[in-house]
Amino acid sequence: MLKINTNDLPELTWSSPKGKFAGSGKQVSEALGRKPLSTDLKERHPFDIEICRIPAGKTPYPYHSHSAQWEFYHVISGKGLVRHKDGTTPIEAGDAFLFPPDEPHQLINPDSESAQDLILYVVADNPIGESGYYPDSKKWIVRSPERRLLRCEPLDYFDGEE
C-alpha cells in the first residue's frame, strides 16, 4: 500500500497573466503515483484528487464545463460562491456538491476583507477523451498533454472535404 500525508505535499501555485485567476493545489493523485498529464490508462487513476486553495478575492479558473468529466467538491474551510447555470450559491466548510458533464461552473472566493482562503477537496473521474468549454469566451480545450485551446466557427459538415 502506498501512503502519503497531504501535509507533506508541495503546493503548486498558478496565476493568469493579469492576475484575475489564481489558486494553488496539492496534487494528491500524483503523489500516489499518477503520471502527470499522461493519457496512458496504465499510468492514470480512475479519478484525480486535489486539495485546492483559492486566495481571498480570487477565482482559480474561468467559468467552464467538461464534456465527460464529473467533479465532486467538499469544502474544508472558508466561504465562497459557486457560479453555475442557475446563478450563484454560497458555500462554506462542510458543504459538498457535484457537477456532472456539460454543466458549467466556477468557484469564487469573494472574501477580500477577511483574507481567508477557501480550501476544498476536488475529486474528478478522469475520463479519456475529455474536452472542456468556456461559455464566457466561447472557446474549447482539448484534453491532451499540450492542453490545446480552440475557438470554433460554424462550418458545413462537408467544408474542405470536396
Q: At which residue positions do the language-model features occur?
A:
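Short histidine-centered beta-strand/loop micro-motifs
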Residues: 38-43, 61-66, 108-110
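Short, conserved beta-strand element in jelly-roll/cupin
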Residues: 46, 51-55, 65-84, 124
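Ligand-binding loop in jelly-roll beta-barrel domains
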Residues: 101-130
